[in-house]
């Protein structure tokens, strides 16, 4: 039989509980905000990209759900402003590939410099695949895992056991239904795989090989959805059976900054160690810069956290403090039951 929660404890315990809820709420809001924010930025600079035309270099932003353009409209009067049609662009803007679309009228509907394509063009000369082909399973599932964490945090803020299980059950059911409908019923998985295959074959035309990659993406994404549903079931059962299991509902989301860095570094390693032999220039496999400044040939690289990563750190810090406070409460409850 589970020990009764300390909802009727003294003023000190009630104050602790309110603090736990406040910290968890701050963490929840910070993580939701981080999903829509750039987490990391990377920039390339070189002599052939003058600072007047490219004040931030060739810059891209990594979000939890993909890679976005990091270049902004040029300052009026600068070289870039004089030579191109200017406008800030985002992931929904029509794009032109500077290699494959060389014969197109690039001024038609032009919106300015797209640094994602610019960096892809630079990278393909050494045999690197387009950046957006990285994390092809993680990106479309990111929103569901963030929702999974949000439900756990919401439940962690609830002290009463039945209410907590209800929050977990309803929340997890909603996330599972959302994932299934989004990926399979609405066909977003199929459209994602199609876009992945097209992007992967942008520079290196090996249709059979790349289609096999697309099939793997479809398979692993289905496995990912299954793992997500299984993880939700394990959490619900764990909270139902074990009192101390509730601490994992704060610990796992608190590790999000670590998860991101490991994922980011792993995919950088993949890109640097899986260079296509058709690249115009031959370079040895290398590890791109994860944090700080580096140099590859004439290019200087810069890789640093963006404000979205700070939001993840805020969420992590709040959750760890809330976890320690809740752990202290659980120990007090255990000691009281033995007295």
Write out the residue ranges for each language-model feature.
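Short, Lys/Arg-rich, polar N-terminal cytosolic tail immediately upstream
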Residues: 1-14
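Membrane-proximal helix-loop-helix units in multi-pass membrane proteins
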Residues: 163-171, 187-253
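Membrane-interface capping segments at transmembrane-helix boundaries
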Residues: 324-335
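Hydrophobic alpha-helical membrane-insertion segments
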Residues: 28-39, 168-187, 248-274
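Alpha-helical transmembrane segments and their helix-start/interface "positive-inside/aromatic belt" motifs
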Residues: 14-31, 159-176, 240-255, 322-325
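Long, glycine/tryptophan/cysteine-rich extracytoplasmic
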Residues: 36-139, 182-218, 265-306
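Hydrophobic alpha-helical transmembrane segments
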Residues: 138-157, 174-177, 219-236, 310-320
